[in-house]
Amino acid sequence: HTQRRRQRQMCIRDRFKISSNSKTIKSNFKEGSKVIVAGRLMSRRIQGNASFAELQDSSGRIQVYFNRDEICTSEDKSKYNELYKRLLDIGDIIGIEGELFKTKVGEKTIMVKDFKLLSKSLKPLPLPKTDAEGNVYDEFTSPELRYRQRYVDLIVNKNVKDTFIKRSKIISSIRKSLENEEFIEVETPILQPIPGGAAAKPFITHHNSLNIPLYMRIANELYLKRLIVGGFNGVFEFAKDFRNEGMDRTHNPEFTNLEFYVAYKDYNWMM
């Protein structure tokens, strides 16, 4: 099956210029407007010469409508009959040019005028299936698989991306708050000759050129304090720390740590 999908890569494009995304289209919808979008094909319902499908991009999902005669205006109908119906698979990334319209039930939809295959999905997506009674099967819910294949989790579980977005906004807000207090963001060494700053067991590696052992950072405290000694009033760092210890759901050997230090203040001011 993977080999068959690889053979379908011949029509892939390296570059595709988009003009909008699904979220912007829905919020600023204007019937008849021309749009160029790209995203992953998540579902489709083929009914002869026409087909409704769902396209997912970084901002959400939108319905798209494929009509053979709209796409293939000449006598040659192979683009719809061969490329769309036979060569495209769920999970493929495609680029679409089309016009906006609403269906009879009011669904905001893109009428496809042209489309291109941008990237081939070599393996089928683990999409959930619903039977006639409404029972859902084959959901991608295994915690082990979700953690090890986060890219698949992001594709098939819509709420996961929100966690990434919230984390980014939280870090951005913390950074702005510290910068408003005139803290300087810095970077300190990850490979250190002496592990310090915390009572933890380090990961050990070896520097071949210098022929010395090095330790992956367990804390960035000591280097930040040296910068305060050097004359900075306030410093902070979002640091990756590594501790070669036990692990559970809340304790990972690799984690992100925020540390900040300031001169001429006490712990009451810090709190």
Where in this protein do the model-derived segments appear?
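Class II aminoacyl-tRNA synthetase-like tRNA-binding/catalytic domains
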Residues: 15-269
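Single conserved hydrophobic/aromatic residue that forms the stacking wall/gate
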Residues: 1-12
